[in-house]
């Protein structure tokens, strides 16, 4: 296999003169391409972390067998709500920990619920089967994303107490660090 490599010297090149205050990514998205525009840079009152200490927003979503499940249906003392995306690398990296967490607390008053925020039912069913998920996996909707203030980002972990008050919000996943943070929050509430 041959390779052609050409090298040229460039001097005083200006590639991008656009300033951040005038830049809008949606100017570069093809016309007709479906997009969602969230309030980037909006005041922090819209952030998920500001839900700590507040009642968790209620939802009714379908599980992978297309049966409705509501937050109010869950009677466990502690609930971990994981807002996830099946195309999200960090979300996939968290799966072994979440499966172990479900096994570890199976005799405790604990429930783990993952809410998929990016795809739809057929994809969820295949994903849950392929990943051998041992916890509840629900088909999310835009209202959950809005109510939980994730802005479409994933993963998020919301730890709820028996009164369904959000006691801790964790954004992102870092193996080891996030595992410890979630486990400590659950232990504190059990």
Stretch-by-stretch model annotation:
Residues 80-81, 112, 157:
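Hydrophobic beta-strand anchors of alpha/beta hydrolase catalytic cores
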Residues 75, 83-100:
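Conserved redox-active cysteine motifs that mediate thiol-disulfide chemistry
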Residues 1-60, 65-67, 74:
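Non-transmembrane domains of secretory- and envelope-associated proteins
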Residues 92-131, 141-147:
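Structural microenvironment flanking redox-active thiols in thiol-disulfide oxidoreductases
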Residues 127-133, 139-187:
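Thiol/disulfide oxidoreductase modules built on the thioredoxin-like
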């Amino acid at each position: 296999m041959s390779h052609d490599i050409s090298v040229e010297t460039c001097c005083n090149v200006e590639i991008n003169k656009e300033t951040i205050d005038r830049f809008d990514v949606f100017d570069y998205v093809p016309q007709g391409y479906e997009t969602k525009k969230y309030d980037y840079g909006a005041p922090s009152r819209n952030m998920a972390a500001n839900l700590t200490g507040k009642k968790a927003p209620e939802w009714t979503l379908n599980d992978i067998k297309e049966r409705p499940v509501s937050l109010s249906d869950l009677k466990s003392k502690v609930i971990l709500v994981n807002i996830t995306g099946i195309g999200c690398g960090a979300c996939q990296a968290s799966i072994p920990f979440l499966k172990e967490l479900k096994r570890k607390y199976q005799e405790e008053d604990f429930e783990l619920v993952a809410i998929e925020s990016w795809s739809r039912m057929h994809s969820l069913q295949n994903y849950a089967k392929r990943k051998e998920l041992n916890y509840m996996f629900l088909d999310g909707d835009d209202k959950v994303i809005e109510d939980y203030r994730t802005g479409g980002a994933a993963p998020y972990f919301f730890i709820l107490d028996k009164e369904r008050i959000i006691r801790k919000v964790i954004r992102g996943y870092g193996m080891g660090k996030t595992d410890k943070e979630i486990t400590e929050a659950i232990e504190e509430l059990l």
